[in-house]
């Protein structure tokens, strides 16, 4: 394991990234903030035979500014939506390992099983503070990320990712309210495969029609309007029609 704490080591990593595919995982600084409004505490880069940890906003960082890297190599990530929101390395070939795991097992990978005692301690101690992950020692982030990279990479199978890329594109644009932009987060990892849409305790897919919850959302354009559309995508009735099953009325 190499902790990138000098420019020399960062240059070494940049060269290595050009040579072969690798796993790229990230730890966000704030466990509560939306990825679009968050920042990365550190990156974990796994080449199978060698691993790097790169502190970005972590307290153990060696400098304030880190250059982004471009590569033609394949990058394996645990969440392509979060990768698109914030990344250290840019590539045209990015594979989502958790999406592959979900399509094989009909459930997402359990990341929380690898959280260390240090992660739980800092989150309990600083539950009301921002950027807590910047305080968790890098060695503990490594301990958390190592098994994730290994397990997901070993089980990866290639699948179409159009759904994830489309959802991320919707997420990054946000929703305008009278006060600010707010961001939702689509969760495609449901038992039915029908994505949910929520963040920060708000279910954007089921806003109350009678208590004024919907009134705060406005068009981002001058003289613009919001148009509501209802459609049948992901509805179980569509599957019934395909296989000839008649659902009972009511």
Question: What is the predicted role of each segment?
Answer:
Residues 21, 164, 223-225:
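Residues at beta-strand starts and edge strands
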Residues 3, 20, 145-147, 205-207:
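A short linear-motif detector with a strong N-terminal bias
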Residues 33-39, 48-49, 179-250:
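Acidic, glycine-rich two-metal-ion catalytic cores of nucleic acid-processing enzymes
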Residues 55, 60-70, 79, 153-157, ...:
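Alpha-helix initiation/capping motif
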Residues 1-115, 240, 246:
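Conserved RNase H-like, two-metal-ion catalytic cores of nucleic-acid enzymes
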Residues 86, 91-93, 97-108, 112-117, ...:
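Mixed-charge, glycine-rich, non-catalytic linkers/tails in nucleic-acid processing enzymes
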């Amino acid at each position: 394991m190499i902790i990138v704490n000098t420019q020399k080591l960062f240059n070494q990593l940049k060269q290595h990234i050009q040579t072969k595919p690798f796993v790229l995982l990230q730890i966000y600084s704030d466990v509560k903030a939306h990825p679009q409004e968050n920042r990365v505490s550190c990156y974990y880069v796994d080449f199978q035979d060698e691993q790097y940890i790169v502190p970005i906003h972590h307290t153990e960082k060696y400098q304030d500014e880190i250059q982004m890297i471009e590569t033609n190599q394949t990058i394996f990530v645990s969440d392509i939506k979060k990768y698109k929101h914030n990344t250290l390395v840019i590539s045209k070939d990015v594979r989502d390992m958790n999406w592959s795991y979900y399509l094989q097992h009909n459930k997402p990978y359990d990341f929380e099983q690898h959280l260390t005692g240090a992660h739980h301690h800092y989150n309990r101690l600083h539950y009301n503070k921002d950027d807590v992950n910047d305080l968790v020692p890098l060695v503990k982030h490594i301990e958390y990320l190592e098994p994730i990279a290994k397990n997901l990479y070993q089980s990866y199978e290639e699948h179409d990712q159009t759904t994830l890329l489309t959802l991320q594109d919707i997420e990054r644009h946000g929703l305008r309210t009278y006060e600010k932009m707010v961001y939702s987060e689509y969760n495609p990892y449901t038992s039915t495969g029908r994505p949910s849409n929520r963040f920060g305790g708000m279910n954007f897919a089921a806003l109350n029609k009678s208590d004024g919850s919907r009134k705060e959302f406005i068009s981002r354009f001058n003289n613009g309007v919001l148009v509501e559309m209802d459609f049948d995508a992901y509805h179980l009735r569509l599957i019934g029609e395909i296989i000839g099953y008649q659902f009972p009325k009511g």
